[in-house]
C-alpha cells in the first residue's frame, strides 16, 4: 500500500460525512470516452465540434444530426460500473458517504447501487416528449433511428443538459447543501473547468479535500492529498 493510499484510507476512516464530486474520468475505466476527446476519425465523420452539436441551438435547428451524434457518442448501453462506482456505493451503504455529485449522464453510479446521486447534467435514462411530456427510457431511444418521436408526434428529448441550457435548480440547491455539510470532499475524474458545475465546490467548507485526477487542476494547491492514478484503481485499494 502506497503512502497516498494509506493517507486516503486514514481520511476516509476518520470521516462520517463524505461527498464525492466526479466527472468524465470516473467512467473512462468503464470504457466510456470523454466526448470532448476528438481524433482524426472524429473530423472525418462530424463537421462540427462536440460543443456545437450538443448545444440547444443545434438540437433545435438540426435534430437529425444531433441524434446521430448523440447515439454514436453519448450512449454506451453496454458499459458497466467500475471499481470506483462500486466503492462509492459501498461507502454509502456503510453510512459514511452522503452523496455523489456527478457531471456524468451515464447512470453508472445507480447501476452500482448508489442511491443519493445528484446528476448535474441529467441522465440518458430519462427522456420526455416535448409536446405531451410522456416518459421514455434509454431503450426507447436505442430502438429508434433518426429523430425519436412520441406516439403524439412530438420529439422525444433526452433529459440531458445541453450547452446554452440551465442546470436544474433543485439539483443545484441539494448539491450545495450536501457540500456545505461534508467533512471530506473527494473530487475525482474532472478537470473542474465545466461551469457552472465546477463552481459548486466553493460551497465546501469541511476539513479535508482530496483530488484524484490524471492531470493537474488549479485546486491541487488547496488539497490535503493529490493522486494522479486512475480513480477506480485508487479507490479499490482503500
Residue ranges and their predicted role:
Residues 1-238:
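Conserved catalytic core of sirtuin-type NAD+-dependent deacylases
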